[in-house]
C-alpha cells in the first residue's frame, strides 16, 4: 500500500487565528499524550485509501479534539493583526502553528510545519520573535520538553498573595482553587514575567499595545490556578490586569485599570468579579505610587467589561447599603451619597451615578410609561445619551468645517502666488492672463443635504436605539444580582 500525504504547491493565504493554536502545558505527561495522539493520527493517515475515507477520518479527528485527550489546554487567538498584516499568513497546505507555553512559567516553544521555501511566504517565526519576550524568547522543542519535565513544577506565583477563592464546576462538581497576587513593575521578577505574559493582550484585546514598562507607575494583579500534580502544588496563569498610578492632588493616587484579561479557557466562570474585587480591596488598605488611592477609573472599557464593572460596583454599593438613603431621582442632589461611595469603595462619581441609574431602573420595572417619575427618569437618561453621543458628532462637524475653511484659505494663497508669477510673464509678453484654480471635484457627488428637522430626527432615532440597548444591559446586570427574574 502506498502512503498518501496530501500537500499543495499552490501558495495560499491562511487566517492566522484559525491556524494558530496556543497550548498551556502543566506537565510532561500532557506532552507525551499529545505525541501519542499525533503518532496515531499519522498511522491512520498512512492507511487512507480514498478521499471519502480521508473525510471520514477528518470528522472523527474533529470529534476527538472536542474531548479531553489528556493533552495541553488548547485555544485560538482572537486577533493577530498586530503580528501578521490583516491577520493573514501566506504559505502552503497544510499550515499549522502550535505555540506551547508552560502553564505557569510561560516558557515557550513554537512548533510549525512551516518551511521557508519562498520569499513570498510569511516568516512566521520571525514575526513572533518581534513580539515575544526579548529576555526569554521561544526555545527549541528538545529544550522545552526538558524544561517542562524538570523545571515547570518549580514555578511559584509572581508577587505577593492577596486573595484566594475556589470555583465549583456546575457539571462535574469539581472544585478548583485560585490565588490572586499583586506586584509592581519595579520588581524585576514581575517585570520579566510580565514581558512573557503581555503577548496575550495582542491576541485578545483589540487595538491593544504593550505598556511602557520603564515607567515605575505600573501595578499588576495576577490570577493563578492551583493544582495538585503528583502530590505537589502546581500553578498556571489564569488572567491578569495592569493598573497605572496617576497623581491626584494633594498627595493621593488615582488608579486606572489599563488592561484586563481572563484567558479564554477560564472565561465565563466568574474570575472577572474576583479579580475586580481584589483590586478594590487591595487599594482600600494599600497606598498607590503617590499615596492613598482616591478612586479607581477604567481606560476605554469594552461593552462586556462595562457589564462586569456595573455588576461589581452595584453589588458592593448595595452590600454596604449606600443607596438606602438616596433620593430616587436622577436630577436630585445626591453628591453626598456619591462622595461616601467614593471614600468607602473607591468608585468614581460618574460610575456611582450610573449605578444609581441601574438601581432606579429596577424600581420602575412594571411601572406604566405614563408614570411621571418614570417618564422623568427616561428623559434624563436620553439627555445624557444625547450629550455623550450627539455632542461628539457635532464636534466632528465643526472640525470638518474648520478643515474646509483651511483648505479654502490654502487654495486662495496658492492662487495668489501663481498669479504673481503669471504677472511677471504677462509683463514680459504683454499679455493679461488670469490664474483660476478650481477645487478638485469630488469623485462621488454629494447627496441632497438634509434640513435641520431631518438631521434632528435621525439623531433622536439614534438615541432611542442606544436607550433600548442600555435597557437590555441594565436587565442583564439586575438579573445577575437577582434583583429581577431572568
Swiss-Prot record:
PANTHER family for this protein: HISTONE ACETYLTRANSFERASE TYPE B CATALYTIC SUBUNIT
Originating organism: Dictyostelium discoideum (Social amoeba)
Enzyme nomenclature, EC number: 2.3.1.48
Name of protein: Histone acetyltransferase type B catalytic subunit DDB_G0274269
GO biological process, one term: subtelomeric heterochromatin formation
Active site: 299 (proton donor/acceptor)
A GO MF term: histone H4 acetyltransferase activity
Residues at which acetyl-CoA binds: 260-262, 267-273
Keywords in alphabetical order: Acyltransferase, Coiled coil, Transferase
Amino acid at each position: 500500500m502506498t502512503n498518501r500525504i496530501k500537500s499543495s504547491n499552490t501558495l495560499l493565504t491562511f487566517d492566522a487565528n484559525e491556524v494558530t493554536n496556543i497550548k498551556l502545558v502543566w506537565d510532561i505527561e500532557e506532552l507525551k499524550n499529545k505525541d501519542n495522539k499525533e503518532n496515531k493520527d499519522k498511522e491512520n493517515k498512512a492507511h487512507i485509501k480514498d478521499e471519502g475515507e480521508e473525510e471520514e477520518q477528518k470528522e472523527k479527528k474533529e470529534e476527538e479534539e472536542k474531548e479531553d485527550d489528556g493533552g495541553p489546554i488548547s485555544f485560538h487567538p482572537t486577533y493577530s493583526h498586530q503580528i501578521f498584516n490583516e491577520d493573514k499568513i501566506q504559505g502552503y497546505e497544510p499550515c499549522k502553528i502550535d505555540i506551547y507555553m508552560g502553564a505557569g512559567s510561560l516558557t515557550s516553544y513554537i512548533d510549525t510545519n512551516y518551511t521557508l521555501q519562498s520569499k513570498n511566504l510569511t516568516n512566521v517565526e520571525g514575526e513572533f520573535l518581534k513580539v515575544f519576550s526579548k529576555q526569554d524568547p521561544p526555545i527549541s522543542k528538545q529544550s522545552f520538553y526538558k524544561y517542562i519535565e524538570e523545571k515547570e513544577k518549580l514555578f511559584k506565583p509572581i508577587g505577593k498573595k492577596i486573595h484566594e477563592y475556589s470555583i465549583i464546576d456546575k457539571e462535574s462538581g469539581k472544585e478548583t482553587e485560585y490565588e490572586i497576587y499583586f506586584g509592581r513593575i519595579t520588581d524585576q521578577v514581575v517585570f520579566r514575567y510580565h514581558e512573557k505574559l503581555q503577548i496575550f493582550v495582542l491576541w485578545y484585546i483589540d487595538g491593544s499595545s504593550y505598556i511602557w514598562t520603564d515607567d515605575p507607575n505600573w501595578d499588576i494583579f495576577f490570577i493563578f490556578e492551583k493544582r495538585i500534580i503528583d502530590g505537589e502544588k502546581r500553578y498556571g496563569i489564569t488572567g491578569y490586569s495592569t493598573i497605572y498610578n496617576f497623581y491626584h492632588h494633594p498627595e493621593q493616587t488615582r488608579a486606572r485599570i489599563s488592561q484586563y484579561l481572563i484567558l479564554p479557557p477560564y472565561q465565563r466562570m466568574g474570575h472577572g468579579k474576583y479579580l475586580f474585587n481584589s483590586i478594590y480591596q487591595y487599594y482600600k488598605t494599600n497606598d498607590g505610587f503617590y499615596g492613598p488611592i482616591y478612586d479607581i477609573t477604567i481606560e476605554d472599557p469594552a461593552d462586556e467589561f462595562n457589564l462586569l464593572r456595573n455588576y461589581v460596583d452595584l453589588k458592593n454599593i448595595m452590600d454596604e447599603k449606600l443607596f438606602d438613603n438616596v433620593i430616587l431621582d436622577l436630577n436630585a442632589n445626591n453628591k453626598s451619597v456619591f462622595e461616601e461611595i467614593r471614600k468607602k469603595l473607591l468608585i468614581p462619581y460618574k460610575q456611582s451615578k450610573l449605578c444609581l441609574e441601574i438601581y432606579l431602573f429596577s424600581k420602575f420595572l412594571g411601572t406604566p410609561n405614563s408614570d411621571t417619575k418614570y417618564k422623568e427618569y427616561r428623559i434624563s437618561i436620553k439627555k445624557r445619551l444625547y450629550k455623550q453621543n450627539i455632542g461628539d458628532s457635532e464636534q466632528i462637524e465643526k472640525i470638518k468645517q474648520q478643515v474646509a475653511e483651511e483648505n479654502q484659505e490654502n487654495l486662495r494663497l496658492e492662487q495668489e502666488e501663481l498669479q504673481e508669477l503669471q504677472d511677471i510673464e504677462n509683463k514680459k509678453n504683454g499679455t493679461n492672463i488670469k490664474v483660476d484654480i478650481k477645487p478638485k471635484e469630488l469623485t462621488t457627488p454629494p447627496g441632497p443635504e438634509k434640513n435641520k428637522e431631518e438631521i434632528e430626527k435621525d439623531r433622536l432615532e439614534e438615541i432611542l436605539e442606544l436607550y433600548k440597548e442600555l435597557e437590555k444591559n441594565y436587565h442583564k446586570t439586575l438579573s445577575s444580582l437577582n434583583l429581577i427574574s431572568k
